From Swiss-Prot:
Its main location: cytoplasm. The gene is MYH16. The rodlike tail sequence is highly repetitive, showing cycles of a 28-residue repeat pattern composed of 4 heptapeptides, characteristic for alpha-helical coiled coils. GO terms for molecular function: actin filament binding; ATP binding; microfilament motor activity. This is Myosin-16. It is found in: Cytoplasm, Myofibril.
Amino acid sequence: MPGGYKGECGDDVDPMPFLAPPEKERIEAMNKPYDIKKSCWVKDEKEGFIAGEIQSEQGDQVTVKTVNNQTVTVKKDDVQQMNPPKFYQASDMADMTFLNEASVLNNLRQRYTNMRIYTYSGLFCVTVNPYKWLPIYGARVANMYKGKKRTEMPPHLFSISDNAYHDMLMNRENQSMLITGESGAGKTENTKKVIQYFANVGGTGKQSSDGKGQGSLEDQIIQANPVLEAFGNAKTIRNNNSSRFGKFIRIHFGTTGKLAGADIESYLLEKSRVISQQAAERGYHIFYQILSNKKPELIESLLLVPNPKEYHWVSQGVTVVENMDDGEELQITDVAFDVLGFSAEEKIGIYKLTGGIMHFGNMKFKQKPREEQAEVDTTEVADKVSHLMGLNSGELQKGITRPRVKVGNEFVQKGQNVEQCNNSIGALGKAIYDKMFKWLVVRINKTLDTKMQRQFFIGVLDIAGFEIFEFNSFEQLCINFTNEKLQQFFNHHMFVLEQEEYKREGIEWVFIDFGLDLQACIDLLEKPMGIFSILEEQCVFPKATDATFKAALYDNHLGKSNNFLKPKGGKGKGPEAHFELVHYAGTVAYNITGWLEKNKDPLNETVVGLFQKSSLGLLALLFKEEEAPAGSKKQKRGSSFMTVSNFYREQLNKLMATLHSTAPHFVRCIVPNEFKQSGVVDAHLIMHQLACNGVLEGIRICRKGFPNRMQYPEFKQRYQVLNPNVIPQGFVDNKKASELLLGSIDLDVNEYKIGHTKVFFRAGILAKLEDMRDERLAKIMTMLQCRLRGFLMRIEFKKMLERRIGLKVIQRNTRKFLELRFWGWWKLYNKVKPLLNVARQEEEMKAKEEELRNAMSKTQELLSRVKELEEKMATLSQEKNDLTIQLQAEQENVIDAEERLTQMMKTKMDLESQISDMRERLEEEEGTAASLSATKRKLEGEMSDLKRDLEGLETTLAKTEKEKQALDHRVRTLTGDLSLREDSIAKLQKEKRALEELHQKTLDDLQAEEDKVNHLTKTNSKLSTQIHELEDNWEQEKKIRAEVEKARRKAESDLKMTIDNLNDMERSKLDLEEVVKKRDMEINSVNSKYEDEQSLNSTLQRKLKEHQARIEELEEELEAERSMRAKVEKQRSDLSRDLEDLSDRLEEAGGATSAQIEQNRKREAELLKLRRELEEAALQSEAAASTLRKKHTDSMAELTEHVENLQRVKSKLEKDKQVMKAEIDDLNASMETVQKSKMNAEAHIRKLEDSLSEANAKVAELERNQAEINAVRTRLQAENGELSREYEESQSRLNQILRIKTSLTSQVDDYKRQLDEESKSRSAAMVSLANTKHDLDLVKEQLEEEQGGKSELQRLVSKLNTEVTTWRTKYETDAIQRTEELEETKRKLAARLQEAEETAEAAQARAASLEKNKQRLQAEVEDLTIDLEKANAAAAALDKKQRVFDKMLAEWQQKCEELQVEVDSSQKECRMYMTESFKIKTAYEESLEHLESVKKENKTLQEEIKELIDQLGEGGRSVHELQKLKKKLEIEKEELQVALEEAESSLEVEESKVIRIQLELAQVKADIDRRIHEKEEEFEATRKNHQRAIESLQASLEAEAKGRAEALRLKKKMETDLNEMEIQLDHANKNNSELVKTLKRLQQQIKDLQVQMDEDARQHEELREQYNLQERRLSLLQTELEEVRSGLEGSERSRKLLEQEVVEITERHNEVNIQNQSLLVVKRKLESDVQRISSEHEELISEFRSADERAKKAMTDAARMAEELRQEQDHCMHLEKIKKNYEITIKDLQAKMEEAEQLALKGGKRTIMKLEARIKELETELDGEQKQHVETVKTLRKNERRLKELVFQTEEDHKTNQRMQELVEKLQNKLKVYKRQIEEAEEQANQTLARYRKTVHELDDAEERAGMAETALNKLRTRHRVAGKGITSV
């Protein structure tokens, strides 16, 4: 299925024939003859299996007649049963009766020949490549499958996709679709269809967020495929559109299932295809698309010709693909670029790089004559490449032919031959294409990242299929390894995890081993010492080749692994195979040629550098990251470079982890034949793929197992409808309920299993349950429809009955009218009756019209009020939406800040790790350099000693030769003179022979010594060269260290700037969680630093151990050297003894000469000298060893001290972390309360909206009532009353809405105020955090400076020691070798002694100045002691006054507590009265409602009375009774009026009181706010004072550091001058010792002063604690009375004075007296403040009493109102009695009405007129009474409203008091924080004092070391004198 989307739109073609067989075809198949016992399948070589019919059976042999009329005899095991015809083209092969290979193959073959390519196979889907377009992928088919179950539609890829989409939404879990199969099986096309389906299902239809006219997100997701196919797909032997890379496409969805973005991960692009292809294959499509000449302007701009044969790299195989138009594909690719938002510059860059790669392949090189150097044949191609890639042509050619290579520390140009140049450009072309492809993927991901909220994703995997070619290389191994892992994942998921879940859930199950474990092959590839591991190892070896790689593979795996085979020989054609691997899909022979280079992937660094400077932006962007890895490789010690296989395996492991975290859906693609012909089936090929993919095993486990499962709650909820009666009412366990439900359904027990948490079903059972559920729901809906239709018909029948009754009444009245129409009286009645009602009707009409107008105006007002409320609700909802939008924006900003912070912290940690690594390496190099320099010096000394020994031996040899000649001459003279003494001559001859032997022996020894000396010189030269190299490396490391130090400083400065910016941002965002996260990150970083320090400590210890071992080795060498020297000395002693014997013999012979004696003396002197030198060398080695041990101990002590400091910092940070966690918990609790209140407010708003909707409905009802008033005149009054009642209800609701609105606005204001307070506290916390960080940084810097100074001192001391030793050795050697230089040395020493005298005089002057300082300090100490005594006396007096003040404060506190108790009791009484008032109010409301009902009844009775009066003729008595009733009503009305006026007056009084209280509360609140603001300003001033104090401390520390630096400088000067102090050193030592004593005495005095200072500080601390106690007590008074501002100001001023005193104590010791005096002043101020506070407290008590009296008065008023309400209730009861009397009178009137009907005809007009006039008067009076009654009701409601407002106001006041208390508590917390900061500052001051003492001790140590150096110089002087005497004696 090659690329593109054409031909798939089959909306005008019926797709069903391509999905499922038609009914006619199915019926024809079912009618075919079939015998279950005879129909079978037998094997066939061509068809795989062929149908047949069993003829006979004989034992194990079966005779079968095939459909080809052939009779065959086969074994019974080779015969497979045939399925019944009803399974013709089964959609799910798991449903077949007989599951065997023949049935599966036949089913797939039948469906494929009919182009039904999709078939279910249990839980997954099998698809066969049709090799042509089918109309089954259009929008029509997609809509058919959308939202459908799997069983409802024929098999299709869309069904699997829709199930994955449904599972994602239902199970809330990520999904993945694994589309696997061999190469050419159709994976890429199926992947495109899946992505297209998901894009359509979850499409939003929105344009991209860029606003550049791009397509929607779904269009961009779909259009990503053409770009990736153009650059990543190519033609292979088995597939015209083969993906030569792997991709995993994640399609992200939001919570509603809509698309939210996508991203793509690519795996292992086949780079080698860029430069080489096999014969029947082609390169990547993009090359041929560009060369198709569809865009001539593109060809022209890229300098190309439209013929692929002109370009070597793309024309090694075929250049045209059948059924693929490259020009059309180029247009599709270009359009896809536009849809994906690629800019024109990016497109041109991509095309230029692609064209440049094609030109790159045409570069030719030739060999220079008589040189191993290649050169470019023609520069035309290079010029084209340079033009397209933005390079310099000459530099490009030079970089390819003569690249720069680093050799040691220098770069040299290396010549390249032709083959190397071709390999270089090939590697560059592959690298450009690979990086461009990766950049394309990143760029597409950037477009598809929409920044929308992502909830879940569905991943679609498309990996290159399993490949078996004639030539299989490294790429095929990686592809096949990936497929092996995916097949193992499938097997593990389908067969292992499934059965493990059965066991886990407790289902009876026998584990089945399907034999599909591929772990052996995977282990062979990826485990340690596997193929990939060996490949990595060989890449590291410098001289590894393909042969060594092959040998390593054979040694490790041949014969040891069944999956590793040696290739079979004898093919004779094709490339050579080096080894074979047994994969799940077959055995593959691999050729390992070039694997090492492919894995290392080397590049020409010179050309890469040119690429980085390219003018083509895209090329420079692709290679700019080449610099970073180089640096990182240098910085990562011991880490190997990242190879291709290593990188690919990391990617694959991440992919497998992603797949394990998702729910997989498998689609297995099948290749039908190897000829790419549609409809042709290769049975053996298909069966091989089915066996390899585990299709049959998957069907078996699906049939045997329980593939479907559900959780018990879900099963109960979904299927309870099948039998709801079986589950009892009440609580029932879900598992028990499911068991009962399953037991009541007609299901076999074997068809399901009950697990611990789930119920499991066999295949198809869940679909059966779904069908049963659908049937049950259909029945329920049918029954419901029946009931509803019956109900509606009954209503219609009632209406019909009512109409029938109405018709009968009309008919009866008509008949009566026809009977009476001619009766005279009836005619008279008809004439008179209208005349009677004319006048009254006109008045009634006017009255009604007036009432109607009033009602209409009221309704208009009501409508306007409703509109206003709607507008207010709209504004409130708009404000709410704005707040939510602001909150979301703030949250997004916080998330962005967190991400930026995490990135910055990561970069910071990386930089710190790099810096620590560089420091470690630098320290190692310094240590090695130091050790090598020490060994160098030692070897130089030994070499000089050996040279001297050699010179001495040479002189000795010359002397012995001279002596030998003299002896020979002597013998000859003696033989001539003493010829008669032959015996003596013979004796002398013997002695001569002995001397010759001895001489020969000495010569041999000398030769051995010369050889040894030569060997030592050689080793010395080697060591010197190594030392030079190490020195060069050390210099380079110094440079690197300097660069790293600069980078570190820059990074630190950048980091500080970014941290400051982040702090500013955090202060503006009002979010405290950021601070907590930042603190956590800092703690983690400190922990990581602590771990790094621990690792550094361990490495240093390890290195120290190594140095100790090295020292031991050197000591062993020294011992060996000593033993060798002892041997030489022994030989020399033997030689001297022999010489002595010889001299004795010569004396016996003729006496020794004076020369021989002198020579013996010289030899003895030389021997003594050698012994002395050996002893000195031993002393030197021991001194060196002792210095090394001392350094080791010092370094260990420093490290332990550093570790302890880090531990202290860690503990402090952990405490801070705990504090911040507690603050976070508090903030979370407050946020929860805020959220709860917000939810309550939203609930109130919803209630208000409901009430508004009800009000709207009632307004509509009012309008209908008005319409009915016009229609029905008789019911006008009743409905008018109803309208007024509803109006009043709506008015009350409206008032209630307004009150709720005010409460909501007040809550919003409270929330805003709380938010402001939180922001202020957060900003204060941030400021304090920044201050502490700054202090910590300062302390760290000081500590580092001190450590640096200490190390500098140690280095100087060691340097002085080495200089002393070098001078000593040099002086001794010079004294021994040359006597002439001694005089010059003496002169130099005299000059230096003169200088030393000058320095000694300077030291004496300095000592005198120190003596003066001592005297001055002693005077200051005496003054300080006097001041201390005065301060102690003042402190004692202050203590006494403080105790008195404490007693006064305790008394006031007791009084305040009593007042608090009284206030609490009054508040309790107030609450009790409030509850009683609420009860009275509710009773009053009930009485009002009752009164309204009575009024309504009264109105109805009045109307009835009017009607009766109209009909009465003689109604005198009734008129009299009505007059009585009227009088009664008037009396009651007057009583009510009086009561209402009294209540109104009392309410007005209460209202004035409430207003006055509100004014007072507002004034108190303003005072409190003002005081809080002043307190905050005071706290800010305090903080600034603290900051100034800390800065002054810092300044003093800096001054102290400068003084220490000055002392160090002077000390260095003294140490440099020590070498010149030789003559007057004794005098200087004496002065120095006196100075040391003086310093010690001064230090002791300073220590005593320090003790006194500590005691004074302790006393001040006690005073400060007492003042803190006063402040706490005063703060308690402030919480209750809020009037103690002046006292707090005084205490704050005193606290400031105390802090200034602490600072002054650390700087100067002579200001204690001034501080004590200031304390006395503060004490007096405090006493005056306390008196003022007491007076103010009394005033506040009086105010509280007056407020209490006012509250009691309000309570009495409330009681009076309650009494009035009781009276009103009694009045209502009285009205109830009147109502009952009215009912009695109504009954009487009804009786009288019957009589009046008889008398009505008898009465005259005159009585009727009188009665009518009387009735009118009564009606007018009644109307007046009603109006007065309405006004009284209004006044009552008004009073009630005022009462509610008063209650609400009191509640608000109570809330404000609570808020003020909370504010005071927060202020107290702030005070505590500030006090804690003061304590920390004091701790820092103490630490600085401790450091000062420490520096004094170090100065003492330095002076002691100087004394030791001076004693050493004295010893040296004495030795020099002894040597001088010896020289003078010589």
